[in-house]
């Protein structure tokens, strides 16, 4: 197995909302690992834009908000699809479909007394009214963040339009698009340096006391040969103690309530007691393994 086949959490992947400046009621939803480059593509500065943003009369487009910190590209694409199809998405919290203006819904509703024998395409249009305001889209984002599936991912929202910034509507960060960078913070870089040093100098798991090169026996030999270089290990950002990621998960599950979720939100260090985001620890584990395989 080549190192490129090993999963690594992306540095950045976001789902963005664009608004047309000449036509403020026109929006576009997409996903990207590079929002700055993607916006230039939508506005025609670079090639490979999108079919729906190609019309010169709708340009320029501006990015009004982006949801990020997804654990994988697949998770971002699922969020993008749900935001594009809020009326039919199973991830919409509350089960009531999307939040759309009453007037918009009324326009698309069938007229009383008319036959229901319409074409499938028309039925699809009637079932999914298009949101025509930035606040409506952000309400749908808020509902997705409350869903059981997305709520445990530790997603973040950055809003670039001050007129849409409302903490009561959606907990988010307000920032200018020019100042926004998809790169992780310097704190994450420092964490990687600490984790890398700990992984290279520590030989045993602090929870099970086994060697850090432990790999479950049920894995095929071909996979063992690769993973033995460095398995998924967790490093505490506070005290740099290390353990197997699976041992940390098992420890959390044993200390949790009977009806606890399968994936933790936060975990506690067995040595210093510091609370750490599970996403942060798990993402770092994939990066450490990639580092070992590429060294």
UniProtKB/Swiss-Prot annotation:
Its EC number is 3.1.-.-. It comes from Meyerozyma guilliermondii (strain ATCC 6260 / CBS 566 / DSM 6381 / JCM 1539 / NBRC 10279 / NRRL Y-324). One of its GO terms (biological process) is double-strand break repair via homologous recombination. CDD domains: GIY-YIG_SLX1. Forms a heterodimer with SLX4. Transmembrane segments: none annotated. It is an enzyme of class 3 (hydrolase). Residues 85-133 are annotated as: Disordered. It is found in: Nucleus. Residues 11-93 form the GIY-YIG domain. The gene is SLX1. Catalytic subunit of the SLX1-SLX4 structure-specific endonuclease that resolves DNA secondary structures generated during DNA repair and recombination. Has endonuclease activity towards branched DNA substrates, introducing single-strand cuts in duplex DNA close to junctions with ss-DNA. A zinc finger (SLX1-type) spans 205-272. It comes from the Eukaryota. Its cofactor is a divalent metal cation. Its main location: nucleus. Keywords: DNA damage, DNA recombination, DNA repair, Endonuclease, Hydrolase, Metal-binding, Nuclease, Nucleus, Zinc, Zinc-finger. GO terms for cellular component: Slx1-Slx4 complex. Belongs to the SLX1 family. This is Structure-specific endonuclease subunit SLX1. GO terms for molecular function: 5'-flap endonuclease activity; crossover junction DNA endonuclease activity; zinc ion binding.
């Amino acid at each position: 197995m080549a190192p490129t086949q090993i999963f690594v959490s992306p540095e950045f992947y976001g789902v963005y909302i664009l608004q047309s400046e000449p036509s403020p009621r026109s929006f576009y939803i997409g996903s990207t690992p590079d929002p700055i480059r993607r916006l230039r593509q939508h506005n025609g500065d670079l090639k490979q834009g999108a079919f729906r943003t190609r019309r010169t009369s709708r340009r320029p487009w501006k990015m009004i908000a982006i949801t990020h910190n997804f654990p994988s590209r697949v998770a971002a694409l699922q969020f993008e699809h749900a935001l594009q199809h809020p009326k039919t998405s199973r991830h919409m919290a509350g089960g009531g479909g999307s939040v759309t203006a009453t007037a918009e819904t009324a326009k698309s509703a069938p007229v009383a007394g008319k036959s229901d024998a319409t074409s499938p395409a028309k039925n699809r249009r009637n079932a999914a009214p298009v949101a025509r305001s930035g606040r409506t889209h952000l309400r749908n984002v808020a509902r997705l963040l409350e869903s059981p599936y997305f709520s445990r991912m530790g997603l973040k929202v950055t809003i670039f339009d001050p007129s849409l910034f409302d903490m009561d509507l959606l907990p988010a960060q307000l920032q200018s698009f020019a100042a926004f960078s998809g790169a992780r913070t310097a704190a994450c870089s420092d964490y990687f340096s600490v984790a890398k040093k700990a992984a290279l100098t520590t030989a045993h798991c602090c929870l099970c006391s086994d060697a850090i090169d432990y790999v479950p026996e049920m894995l095929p030999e071909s996979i063992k040969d690769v993973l033995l270089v460095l398995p998924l290990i967790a490093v505490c950002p506070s005290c740099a103690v290390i353990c197997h990621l699976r041992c940390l998960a098992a420890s959390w599950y044993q200390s949790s309530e009977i009806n606890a979720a399968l994936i933790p939100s936060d975990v506690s260090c067995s040595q210093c007691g510091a609370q750490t985001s599970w996403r942060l620890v798990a993402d770092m584990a994939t990066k450490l393994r990639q580092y070992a395989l590429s060294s």
